[in-house]
Amino acid sequence: MNADRIAASYRWLEYAAFGLALEKARFDSLSRAAEARRVLILGEGDGRFLARLLEYNQNASVTVIESSARMIQLAERRVPACERSRVEFHQMDAVAGAFPDGPFDLAVTHFFLDILNPRDAEAVILKVNARLAPGACWLVSEFQEPTGALRLLHARLWLSAMYGFFSITTGLRASKLPPYRDLLERAGLAEIEHRERRFGLIRSQVWRKNCSGSDMSAAAFIPIDKPVK
């Protein structure tokens, strides 16, 4: 997959299709990043989440892995000059590339796992998990196939349209969602928080490594009412 072709227009394509729903999902659990010192982001895209993270947490160092050179350029423009020393960009394929060493105390994948086939999704999840500190959180925003006949039909229609569009415009090879939640659980992570939008099509989640049953508190959601510039 190569997102260079649609990088400049991606934000507007997103807004046209979903309004602010994806943007809100990215920021739902931003409060979980408050104490993070090392953050790993896969598939950041045009930098909207990165910019908000740097503003919200002014001490964290951030490592970004992104395959699209054009997306990295857009993301770099969103990083203020005074904050550039805190961000390290790596243009690489997350499946085949070698990740920086951990430990990280926060991982972030927003609408990234859905572009991977099951085998590649499992490989990426294991690579990230191996670099997470015990107790670290992983923020995941993704599409899903929800329960309920009407909700499921709605989701499948949207997913079919999206996979078809990205197959044509980016060369995406995946054609359906990988079982990412099962893969995260199999890797030893536990979902401790979630929120759904768009009839269950969109799910923002917080997963924790080595989560104990006594630590299931939910952080307050961070509302967003306008697009990120």
Residue ranges and their predicted role:
Residues 19-36:
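Conserved alpha-helix/loop element of class I SAM-dependent methyltransferases that forms part
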Residues 97-107:
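A short acidic, Gly/Pro-enriched loop at the edge of an enzyme's catalytic core
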Residues 141-187, 194-195:
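C-terminal alpha-helical "lid/dimerization" subdomain adjacent to the S-adenosyl-L-methionine
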Residues 106-119:
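A short SAM/SAH-binding and catalytic strip from SAM-dependent methyltransferases
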Residues 122-134:
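A short glycine-rich, Lys/Arg-flanked "PGG" loop and its adjoining helix->strand segment in the class I
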Residues 1-21:
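Class I SAM-dependent methyltransferase Rossmann-like catalytic core
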